[in-house]
Amino acid sequence: MNLKNFSSIVLLAFFCTQIFQLSVHGIDASSKLYIVYLGERKHSDPEVVTASHHEKLTPLFGSKEEAVSSIVYSYKHGFSGFAAMLNESQVHILSDMPDVISVIPNRKFAAHTTRSWDFLGLDYSSNSNSLLQKGKYGEDIIIGVIDSGNLVSNTSFHGLAAGSTRGGAPRARLAIYKACWGSGVWCSGAALLAAVDDAINDGVDIISMSIGGSDEFPGTLHAVAKGIPVVFSAGNEGPAPQSVKNNVPWVITVAASTIDRTFPTIITLGNSQRLAGQSIYYEIQHSNTNDFTTLVDGSSCDSTTLTEQNITGKIVLCYNPTAIPGVLPRYNFGYAAQNVLDAGGRGIIYAQYTTNILYPCRGGGPCALVDFDIANKINSYIYSTSNPLVKISPAYNIEGKQVLAPRVAAFSSRGPNPRFPGILKPDIAASGVSILAAVNGGYQFMSGTSMACPHVTGIVALLKSLHPDWSPASIKSAIMTTASDTDSYGVQIEAEGTPRKIADPFDYGGGHIDPNKAADPGLVYDIDPNDYTKFFNCTLGPSDDCDSYVGQLYQLNVPSITVPDVKDIVSVWRTVTNVGPINSTYKSFVQPPAGVSVFVEPDLLSFDNNNKVKTFKVTFVANRKVQGDYTFGSLTWSDSSNHSVRIPLAIRIVIQDYYADTA
């Protein structure tokens, strides 16, 4: 089946799973589900590939029937492999076979579960010259979305202009693959690999996965080798360092950032002091929002504390326990709000270190988010009077340059890359905070890198429509090298956390995505798929003749340079391809990392019709003999046509064979 032959606007290709009992001889109680990866297919006929899987397992089970019964998934389209119920003895036998690349136990992976498109510069007006129009709104681009495959009954998904909201590539088509189940939305590695295999066979143009653990999915390597870009979310475990997921170089890993919209609400205290918070609290018809309500201090608002107080009908001030590193404030808000509601409280004022994430007000009562400075003022007022009162007014909307944006979200997972230190991750940041998303029966503000991932997927669809001959590596390069490292006021982007800081490449990769600049990057850092295969074989697969390669992963031609171990001098090579004006000359500009000298040879690159590809060398010299952490800089190639091709530099000086820091 080829999806290109379908005329429907939205295609749903749901995966279904079967729950079954395995009781045949050869599959004993100790058997577990394993993924056996065999690499490229040896046959073009999928049925022959599956037959080869049966043939491989038959000696292990004693009969073909039992071998067939053991297989849960046969990967036969984009690559070769299978998921089967195996015991430890069978696993050892398979692992020793020369044509078996890997045998890994099936794992569960967590799903990383409007105005944002205008903020990104994708103007929907007909006279706009943005990437949206240049890319024909993503027309006929098929996006394979691999996740929980939920059917959302909402007219926004109507394919015939009946929707009430728009996306980034509104004329693209969707192929939805179900690989995740359960209330917590956990995704089976075996099912995810099967979904990738089917997506390749179905002819999708892009694969989007808001799921953790891409290094466990070798199928994505085959997708990219076939010209299919793969977009992953970075994870929601920030701001802790080395928390980023999906760390292989062939995928686009997306961090989350804020947008230029906020919903302030006025909190009026009984002494007439007016303070600002954030909320999506709105006035319910016939409710008396002019009334003041008794205000109490609920501290962390655990159920025990609230039970000891009489909070019935009152508004409670609660604090997020920020003493716990890496705790996501959204979890604690829900916990506190539910406790307040259960104890009879009318509403909640919740204090945390960032107020950009919006939550629905539980029970229809008033709620507001405040930072700790505001909370301390409220707390001081509570203990200054015998009858503290408060009124939370309905929120209103502010958008545009009045709102400082973007900022990297506190929850967005951070680098450095925990698996491959010489590869920068995440790759890019995009809108992922308080995004209006369609749900059953309406809309809801949602936050997460799972919100940021679809933004980049939509932009990739537009780029693929505009430049159908570009490889996945070229598209990724265009996105990263044109990204912005400054906010709407030209000030360096900040990263939220404890404390807030100036963002660096470990927070946002190349920067915050700029779709319109990505349409015309000037130069791209392209990569031969064979180089990805070598990377896989030397890091995740068979490792023959890889000793020198593994120590220099930073030589892969990605649009960034990360060297974790500069002792004295390290030289790195990069190659760029001209996709701009045929006759052009680029000059290099370096912002060196602190404590490092950077030399570029040559510092001029000239292109013409016969010279479209150029290689250059970047040499890093350690100026200080101190065991340190990473410092950051950039290398930019600029021409006379306003092309500015910037890649981030992340360098760590070491004097011993160990690393003093990870951040």
Where are these regions (language model features)?
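Loop-rich non-cytosolic ectodomains and luminal regions
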Residues: N2-A663
